[in-house]
UniProtKB/Swiss-Prot annotation:
It is an enzyme of class 3 (hydrolase). The gene is xseB. It comes from Streptococcus pyogenes serotype M1. GO terms for cellular component: cytosol; exodeoxyribonuclease VII complex. Bidirectionally degrades single-stranded DNA into large acid-insoluble oligonucleotides, which are then degraded further into small acid-soluble oligonucleotides. This is Exodeoxyribonuclease 7 small subunit. Heterooligomer composed of large and small subunits.
Amino acid sequence: MSKTKTFEENLQDLETIVNKLENGDVPLEEAISEFQKGMLLSKELQKTLQAAEKTLVKVMQADGTEVDMDD
């Protein structure tokens, strides 16, 4: 059973992929595969950040209703 990785773990994985690709000593097939993994990680990280932003822009009023902070 695999556990879901945290935002920080996914970010570290993405940084590892970027560093590997920046070094340039990766065979083409592996570079393409790593690039695809990196793109998937990037999308997942973006979704996590967007969800966090939605949570942070709302505040609870005393009566329990939510108010958008960007109004």
